[in-house]
Amino acid sequence: MAAKVASGTNKVFQNHDDVHISFEDQQRINRFAKHNARMDDFKAELETKRNELKSLEEALEEIELFDEDEDIPFLVGEVFLSHKLEKTQDMLKETKEQVLKEIAGVEAKAKVIKAEMDELKAHLYQRFGSNISLEAED
């Protein structure tokens, strides 16, 4: 690191254009970048799951209007199976509960990653100050 001593004093001024990056610092930067990419994946997955949840809730509302003895097609894998109203409602509720669990799981993973990212960000900003930018580019 380049340092300059002010004349007549013992103060040291550092030239911020010449910052030494240690191997450990590079590892932290790389880990932060990986976590940032994972967070983007989690955001996309959460959006997909929330849209799926919304569709399930709308389907539950719509089938309320059907007759009890009418067959209602329900998508299982790649095929539609027809069931009576009550059975279809039960299947939709089970699917909704599963999607809610999946959303909670993704949110929990994202929370852990976010905590580690915050820790890395604090360390890297302390070390490099304004010479590094770790903010998302939205």
UniProtKB/Swiss-Prot annotation:
Pfam families noted in UniProt: Prefoldin_2
Keywords: Chaperone
CDD domains documented for this protein: Prefoldin_4
Membrane keyword on record: no
UniProt superkingdom: Eukaryota
Subunit structure, as described in the record: Heterohexamer of two PFD-alpha type and four PFD-beta type subunits.
Protein name per UniProt: Probable prefoldin subunit 4
Organism from which the protein derives: Drosophila melanogaster (Fruit fly)
Top-level taxonomy: Eukaryota, Metazoa, Ecdysozoa, Arthropoda, Hexapoda
